[in-house]
Amino acid sequence: MAMKRIAVLNVVGLTRSVIDDMPRLREWSKKREVMSFKPAFPAVTCTAQSSYLTGKPVGEHGIVGNGWYDREDAEVKFWKQSNHLVKGKKVWEEAEVRCAKMFWWYNMYSSADFSATPRPLYPADGRKFFDI
């Protein structure tokens, strides 16, 4: 029996009410079962993704925001990438299945079978660009 494939699309602000305005996503979703997650709190990228990937609340996975103050180094650290920062087993580890984790945070040193790590670039004028 073939394993059921699952795709988790993490798109900020995407709700069922706007899928009809997106032709490709609308067609893709018509052929599949579409489900929603309860929004994570706080609603910031790193915390939300860590909650979705572990199934745990912030108090258990430990990622309280996109950055934190490091007392030892006396500096604020933003957008760190090591998967070792996220406490707890990931959903694919619990399910013992193969996983491709593409462009999510905390991808470095992840146990996912396939991954690509985002690398944002911040020019001095305040813009933000994504790269890999």
Tell me what each language-model feature is:
Residues S17-E60, A100:
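Short, structured active-site-proximal loop/turn typified by the sulfatase FGly-forming signature C/S-X-P-X-R
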Residues K56-I132:
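His/Asp/Glu-rich, glycine-adjacent segments
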Residues K4, F41-V44, H84-K89:
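Short, exposed beta-strand "edge-strand" segments with a Pro/Gly-rich flavor and a Y/T-containing core
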